[in-house]
């Protein structure tokens, strides 16, 4: 049995295909199989598409710039894309009037791959995407994935067999903040002992069921909510600001508050303050200091 604390990491930007591979390999914890090349990532992404695993394409942002009205009209109606319109581009030292933020999945599912000819590096007029890696308990992950305008890839207890060598033949659990920060040493010792005993029992039963021939998707039913999971979440800054508004709030669970405030500091290099106001106005200025996009949002993900 392994006990760790939760953590969050703002992932570095990379190519579309490497973003897809990075997220997808989280599900099976197969990162070691990646050859870490652009060609390998492209082939991996093509296999995802061939097998219909489009959800992983959510993690590949695409930034476009164009003056074509027909392209604007398509993305303006697409609930998973954002469009920013500049009526007088010259006033902004720009050659384009439409700045579009979307993802690779939208292009693939709508047979619009040809629009990649309009792809540009992200500008201040785009609704910038960020990918984040959470290492947390299943309980906290359940709260994170309720933010449905983000795309997710999560470590799978169906396919990850924790009795295997690559997991050191053990189950990893997250130590809850309540156990870490109890008021007195005596209470902390008692609570910690009871917690670790419960986790040890769960691991024992899980490994025993695997040894008896059960598959991971069956044996996982005895694992508690404190079981460690890894989760990659990707989405535009507008979605992340909504995440911060809800998860940094005093009413949020203490453990997710800690993660959210840590992530906010990583994104903006300053501490979260309850005085920060986030809005969904189409003309708001984003936290990054750039002009945000006019966004068409939906309450459902693409898959």
How should each PLM-predicted stretch be described?
Residues 1-303:
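Family-specific signature for flavin-dependent thymidylate synthase
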């Amino acid at each position: 049995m392994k006990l760790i604390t939760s953590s969050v990491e703002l992932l570095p930007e990379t190519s579309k295909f490497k973003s897809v591979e990075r997220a997808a390999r989280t599900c099976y914890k197969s990162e070691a199989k990646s050859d870490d090349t652009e060609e390998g990532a492209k082939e991996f992404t093509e296999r995802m598409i061939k097998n219909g695993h489009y959800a992983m394409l959510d993690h590949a942002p695409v930034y476009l710039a164009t003056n074509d009205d027909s392209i604007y009209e398509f993305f303006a109606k697409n609930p998973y894309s954002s469009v920013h319109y500049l009526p007088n581009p010259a006033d902004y030292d720009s050659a384009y009037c439409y700045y579009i933020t979307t993802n690779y999945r939208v292009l693939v599912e709508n047979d619009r791959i040809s629009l990649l000819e309009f792809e540009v590096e992200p500008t201040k007029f785009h609704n910038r995407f960020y990918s984040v890696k959470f290492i947390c308990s299943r309980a906290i992950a359940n709260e994170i994935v309720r933010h449905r305008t983000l795309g997710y890839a999560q470590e799978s207890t169906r396919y990850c067999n924790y009795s295997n060598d690559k997991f050191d033949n053990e189950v990893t659990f997250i130590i809850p903040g309540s156990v870490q920060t109890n008021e007195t040493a005596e209470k902390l010792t008692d609570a910690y002992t009871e917690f670790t005993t419960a986790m040890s029992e769960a691991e024992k039963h899980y490994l025993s069921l695997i040894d008896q021939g059960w598959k991971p998707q069956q044996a996982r039913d005895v694992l508690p909510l404190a079981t460690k999971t890894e989760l990659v979440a990707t989405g535009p800054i507008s979605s992340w600001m909504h995440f911060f508004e809800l998860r940094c709030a005093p009413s949020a669970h203490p453990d997710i508050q800690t993660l959210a405030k840590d992530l906010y500091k990583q994104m903006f290099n300053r501490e979260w303050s309850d005085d920060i106001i986030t809005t969904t106005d189409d003309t708001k200025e984003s936290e990054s200091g750039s002009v945000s996009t006019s966004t068409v949002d939906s309450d459902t993900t693409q898959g």
